[in-house]
Amino acid sequence: MKWRALVCCGIAVLVGGCAQIGYFVQAAHGQFSLLSEARPIDEWISSPGTEGKLKSRLTRVKEIRAFAARELGLPDNDSYTTYADLKRPYVMWNVVATPELSLKPLQWCFPVAGCVNYRGYYSKGEAQAYAAELRAEKYDVEVSGVPAYSTLGWFKDPVLSTFIQYPDGELARLVFHELAHQVVYVPGDSKFNESFAVAVEEAGVERWMELHGDEKTRKAYGAYKERKRDFLALLLKQRKALTANYERDVSDDDKRKEKAAIFQALKDEYLVLKENWGGYSGYDRWFAEPLSNAHLSAIATYHDFVPGFRAMLAKQKDLGKFYAAVRSLSTLNKDERHRQLAGLGESTSVTAGNTLGNDMR
């Protein structure tokens, strides 16, 4: 899930109250530190001190960036024309929280981004400290690393060391996804925004592979999509089971027992998936913390409306017309646009995409 930069931090501090000042200060410091560390990609490529492998990856990003503007109609601006070596595994860490017996996530509201289902920190320690506060209040909590995010065109989003080594298909997917947020973004509607970006990334990578993917690249990305599809299906299955459990007319203790059984089933079935994948362990990080509702709450944000957006794109048969139709849809009230997307996607099956919202490669 991509945390939207708090680009109006000064205003936010004034309106957020004393309890929020520390949070907004770290957000402002983190964003501007990121920008100060970025240098133009061409400088990195021409520098004798840049390793050959990094030069190759940065050259690939330039090709992907040009393709995004030329073939996909995505914004042709300064985003992803600079590079920053952060010397850490993630650009930030998101905190997601839900009640103990519910999948409905807490929301935090910010300028520009509106209300979102997560709270981002540039420091893992600060994210974990806030997560501990929420756990003390009996919330289910997840802390997940984020490799990239979008400032919605307010700043020059840099290419980062946190994702530059991704294989070509996954690198293109991420760039297309983040640029899509600059095309259409509705403050306070994460499910709409993320599902739209997933639909764009899927269409974009398909076109990229047709024109630029060799057999090895296509095979690698195909395997990636199959694993992601399998894992998503498992998560959706257990999310459905949890929803049914929390709706039962039984005691909270009974719900807690069934909740534990569902999460154990999730772990057991994941081990079977790993065996079927030949031991691939890329999703092991998802189980690094004790499983909770928070882990599964984000699945709806990144999946539920993707089928509807796919149906819209199939009908328009042109990305420009698709973007225009999505912009028109975005002007409706939230309930109505959700209703229309749900109706469009009713008959569409699940396929893989950036549906997990974090670094689930």
Identify the meaning behind each predicted range.
Residues 7-16:
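Bacterial N-terminal signal peptides
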Residues 35-52, 106-116, 289-290, 307:
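Acidic/histidine-rich, surface-exposed loop or edge segments in extracytoplasmic proteins
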Residues 16-39:
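Bacterial Sec signal peptide processing site at the extreme N-terminus
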Residues 64-228:
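Acidic/His-rich structured neighborhood in mature extracellular/periplasmic domains
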Residues 235-361:
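Pan-zinc metallopeptidase signature
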Residues 32-35, 44, 48-62, 121-125, ...:
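Soluble non-cytosolic domains of exported or imported proteins
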Residues 46-50, 59, 63-73, 180-184, ...:
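Sec-exported extracytoplasmic/periplasmic mature domains
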Residues 1-7:
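Bacterial N-terminal signal peptides that target proteins for export
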